[in-house]
């Protein structure tokens, strides 16, 4: 369906949990262990109900996020049941990759088509520094297993000043021999991210163009989503840029979000929305739930205002919202 600005909203991002098995520095406090109690999370049946009603009004693609979605029990059955919904054309997962390698075959067999894996460095010591408790080899193993099982892979990378800027060329080489899309995501001022200085994607692109032959005269192509892509001569995969801060893409936004507690967010930045979990637990019918979702989608704001200090800003951390 369309929102009031005429954008076609066909993509649902739904967070299964705020829990994570890493503590990435720009996402979560080092010693954080105060997560949402299980009885406040949407149940898997509630999640499935939301997906069904969203599908009935035009949602075609579902992405499961977190926190780390793979720490949520029952995810295989959830994907299996979402895959049975006729209107849903694609099920995707955003993950840190630590647990994925040993699960991807089963996930794929039950309907998972794509994964986005967060990876900011190829150096073990830096990986430990940024994630605080992670192991790089597990992520690289997960990428390998995804390719073996024909699950399409995108790698999401955040470049931080004075941390991994010198690895840009090494990181894009992941897309050289493999059909992997690597996307540079500009750091957004959410939660712990406000404490770091990111690098703009225009600067990253200039670094790449100095060393690689960018095809199509360096012009970028926006596909179905916020990323603009370039092709590099000899590369099997593409390089993408998600530039939320320097190149607002809100006019093409096609998504709606639901947090682990069932709060439907119309925009990542804005705090407004409606709690679907509470409505369901109060006994509303499927038709009533559908109408609430339709109204929420229709009222989606025109754009974010990350660069402004707004009273309407969502103060929660990214892992609480759904990354």
Swiss-Prot record:
Keywords linked to the UniProt accession: 4Fe-4S, GTP-binding, Iron, Iron-sulfur, Lyase, Metal-binding, Molybdenum cofactor biosynthesis, Nucleotide-binding, S-adenosyl-L-methionine
Domain of life: Bacteria
PROSITE patterns noted in UniProt: MOAA_NIFB_PQQE, RADICAL_SAM
CDD domains: Radical_SAM, Twitch_MoaA
Annotated binding of GTP, by residue: 13, 63, 94, 154, 255-257
Cofactor(s) this protein requires: [4Fe-4S] cluster
Annotated cofactor note: Binds 2 [4Fe-4S] clusters. Binds 1 [4Fe-4S] cluster coordinated with 3 cysteines and an exchangeable S-adenosyl-L-methionine and 1 [4Fe-4S] cluster coordinated with 3 cysteines and the GTP-derived substrate.
EC number from the UniProt entry: 4.1.99.22
Annotated catalysed reactions: GTP + AH2 + S-adenosyl-L-methionine = (8S)-3',8-cyclo-7,8-dihydroguanosine 5'-triphosphate + 5'-deoxyadenosine + L-methionine + A + H(+)
Residues where S-adenosyl-L-methionine binds: 26, 67, 118, 188
GO biological process: Mo-molybdopterin cofactor biosynthetic process
Metabolic or biological pathway, per its Swiss-Prot or TrEMBL entry: Cofactor biosynthesis; molybdopterin biosynthesis
Function: Catalyzes the cyclization of GTP to (8S)-3',8-cyclo-7,8-dihydroguanosine 5'-triphosphate.
Family membership noted in the UniProt record: Belongs to the radical SAM superfamily. MoaA family.
Protein's UniProt name: GTP 3',8-cyclase
Species, as recorded: Clostridium perfringens (strain SM101 / Type A)
